[in-house]
């Protein structure tokens, strides 16, 4: 009997400790990064639990607006091959994940880029959406979301477009005609408006989703 009471007491203490952790407030600070687009050919963003909104900039610069805390931050660097990378890093402990996520505003990355000046755009994130405007890049676009949607207006890439979600939908318009593309697509547990396989195009379009719909039009 004493052993049972002791175990119940320890359980209650554990719940109290975890409840205390869940009410802890985290302070976020807004950060801003900018660079002249003449220095950048490729942008590669690798994030976790972040919504990523891509917009067009009003000039020839690239801008990134984001938020950091003492426990969650980003490493931004430009390599010798003109690749701008932004990668998520964290010092959060297990108990820091109790109580839900920070407000969406503090978990949103706003990327503003010039039209037609990038070679490639690569974005990965989890648990939130990726949104893009009507965008043209000279080489490739690659988007991946785990538990989120990919939404875009019109995408135009010189060579390759690759889009993938898990537990999310993919919606938008690809610029061109069906004859332009070699297509691979598959929607597991969802609807697919693209052919699963089509050969003969000089561009590559790959679209995959698990537990989501693919609603993509190809139009000139």
Write out the residue ranges for each language-model feature.
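Short, surface-exposed interaction patches in beta-rich subdomains
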Residues: 150-220
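Short, T/G/N/S-enriched strand-turn elements that build extracellular solenoid repeat scaffolds
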Residues: 32-34, 51-56, 73-77, 99-100, ...
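Repetitive beta-strand solenoid architecture
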Residues: 39, 48, 58, 80, ...
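Short linear S-[DN]-x-LW-Φ motif typified by the pepsin-like aspartic protease active-site region
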Residues: 23-81, 85, 214-220
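Positively charged n-region of N-terminal signal peptides that target proteins for export
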Residues: 1-5
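Mid-chain, structured segments of secreted extracytoplasmic proteins
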Residues: 74-104
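Mid-length scaffold segments of soluble, non-membrane domains
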Residues: 142-143
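C-terminal motif of bacterial Sec signal peptides marking the signal peptidase cleavage site
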Residues: 17-20
């Amino acid at each position: 009997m004493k052993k049972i009471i002791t175990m119940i007491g320890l359980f209650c203490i554990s719940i109290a400790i975890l409840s205390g952790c869940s009410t802890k407030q985290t302070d976020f600070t807004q950060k801003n990064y900018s660079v002249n687009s003449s220095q950048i050919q490729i942008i590669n963003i690798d994030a976790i639990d972040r919504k990523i909104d891509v917009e067009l900039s009003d000039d020839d610069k690239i801008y990134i607006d984001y938020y950091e805390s003492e426990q969650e931050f980003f490493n931004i660097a430009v390599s010798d091959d003109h690749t701008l990378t932004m990668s998520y890093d964290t010092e959060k402990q297990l108990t820091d994940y109790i109580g839900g996520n920070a407000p969406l505003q503090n978990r949103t990355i706003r990327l503003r880029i010039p039209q037609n000046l990038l070679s490639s755009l690569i974005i990965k994130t989890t648990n939130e959406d990726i949104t893009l405007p009507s965008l043209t890049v000279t080489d490739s676009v690659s988007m991946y979301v785990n538990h989120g949607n990919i939404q875009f207006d019109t995408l135009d890439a010189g060579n390759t477009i690759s889009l993938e979600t898990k537990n999310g939908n993919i919606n938008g318009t690809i610029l061109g005609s069906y004859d332009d593309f070699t297509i691979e697509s598959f929607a597991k547990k969802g609807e697919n408006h693209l052919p699963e396989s089509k050969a003969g195009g000089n561009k590559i379009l790959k679209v995959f989703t698990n537990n989501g719909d693919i609603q993509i039009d190809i139009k000139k």
